[in-house]
A protein has these predicted regions:
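Membrane-embedded catalytic cores of phosphoryl/pyrophosphoryl-handling enzymes
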Residues: 41-147
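Arginine residue identity/basic-tract feature
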Residues: 9-12, 31, 115
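Transmembrane alpha-helix boundary signature
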Residues: 1, 25-40
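Core segments of transmembrane alpha-helices
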Residues: 17-29, 74-80
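N-terminal transmembrane-helix/juxtamembrane module of multi-pass inner/ER membrane proteins
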Residues: 1-19
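Detector for Asparagine
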Residues: 3, 34-36, 93, 101
Length: 147
């Protein structure tokens, strides 16, 4: 790695693969605990699975093109939280969850804007990161997609 910010696209791939392995091990442990705890972790497992899927797709894209991983991460978190809000609105305080989602959307804008101001990514790289992260996490959480 030539720099802490990893500006070279090909240097990101080993790190992304390491993170995928780490997320997968965490998913395996939580899946085991979930079976023993009456499936209490199910929404969080779908959240974690969405993160794994996002990272795998981002790694494949990174082979040919640089994508904004910061935008992918913050928008994925926003999409997952929106999914949790939509599936469990009766359980949680709706106003509180909307406040959290509003804050996350503002953070998503700030992070994305900062990537553009720092000139570390192009507009299209940031937009692809946002769309990919948000849509995958929202889909996984909303439709209960996991292994």
């Amino acid at each position: 790695i030539s720099n802490f910010s990893i500006p070279k696209r090909k240097q990101r791939i080993p790190i992304l693969l390491l993170v995928i392995v780490y997320y997968s091990m965490t998913y395996y442990v939580f899946r085991h605990w979930n079976n023993n705890l009456f499936h209490l972790f199910e929404p969080f497992l779908t959240f974690l699975f969405g993160g794994i899927v996002s990272l795998v797709i981002a790694t494949i894209i990174t082979i040919k093109w640089k994508i904004s991983l910061h935008a992918l991460a913050i928008s994925g978190f926003s999409g997952g939280m929106l999914g949790l809000l939509l599936i469990s609105g009766e359980v949680y305080n709706l106003q509180e969850m909307m406040a959290y989602n509003t804050i996350l959307l503002l953070l998503m804008g700030l992070v994305s804007y900062s990537r553009l101001v720092l000139k570390t990514h192009t507009y299209s790289q940031v937009i692809v990161g946002i769309v990919l992260g948000f849509s995958i996490e929202l889909s996984c959480v909303l439709f209960h997609i996991s292994l």
